[in-house]
């Protein structure tokens, strides 16, 4: 049986595109299948979110030649201020405390990332982007995987990467169970323009209903991720502009002067999901097909990018040695490499959300003192900053800024 591709990727979101670019850029024959229309993916109304790109993730984008197409629309995060509601005690991260010029990360609109990835994907001769199509099912054997596409075609490959999101049909078809629950919270996402410059400072206020994050964007704008009780979010999103602006200003404060909401508003229900396994016969899960975490730390996309970096390294190294890229031993190595990172981050974000998203007075005192204590322990603080930058642990080559 001849392969139509060495690697088949189901899902053309940010992680699926990035894996395709990494592997095709190293010479692998890749087929990427997505049910969406590529033109619609670039529409301003497709996805209103911005992502926090950690330093380690920026290194991946740079190593793959993507960062020059993103940098002009990426706002550096120079400081992070974390406070429990309006408490005087807060945690303050400053990139200068690490003794380097590199920022803690960048805020980039998802549409900017998607545009750069799509353009790069289209330029690679060994990457076939098949859309709008769906992978209807995958049959695997010890020797190959065969996928049925929604247009009746069948593709064979050595390995299938499921980048098909939290509800991953391929994960379910493989019988991979999940641990999951929905939070009684919804994220309201919008963009604001403000009177004063933000100076590259990201702010996170922990309010009783959930975190309220103010993320610096280019041009005196900020992205707002407003976590609210699910039963209230629909009403807030439907408010007239003036009423919504008043509700927003009451939580935002006046430290940046007058604040004006601009552009659409979006809502996203929040959940936690962890797959019990990341692999099956000739199948590997990446990104939200493997894990979904609370956005309290802004680390969801970074977690998926580290999946991509690890899996791409294993695939390309195996191919150079003449090995089968879908071999069970290699897939188990990928699972071992990535699972603990996701488990720890899911536990931390879930714990922080539960600890801070309430108004219980004794808990509030403990967490305020905890934030202040961390702020006064430089070694711990520097470790937490480096961890948030995605540069701790067993790092794939791409995360270290090295080519595959």
Model-predicted segments: where are they?
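C-terminal helical "tail/cap" subdomain of flavin- and related membrane-associated enzymes
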Residues: 313-404
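Conserved FAD-binding catalytic core of PHBH/FMO-like flavoproteins
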Residues: 61, 144-148, 153-154, 159-258, ...
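Conserved N-terminal helical subregion
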Residues: 2-4, 62, 73-173, 181-186, ...
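Glycine-rich FAD pyrophosphate-binding loop
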Residues: 24-49
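N-terminal FAD cofactor-binding segment of flavoenzymes
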Residues: 45-85
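FAD/FMN-dependent oxidoreductases across multiple families
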Residues: 234-329
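N-terminal Rossmann-like FAD-binding beta1-loop-alpha1 element of flavoenzymes
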Residues: 5-32
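Conserved Rossmann-like nucleotide-cofactor binding loop
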Residues: 15, 38, 167
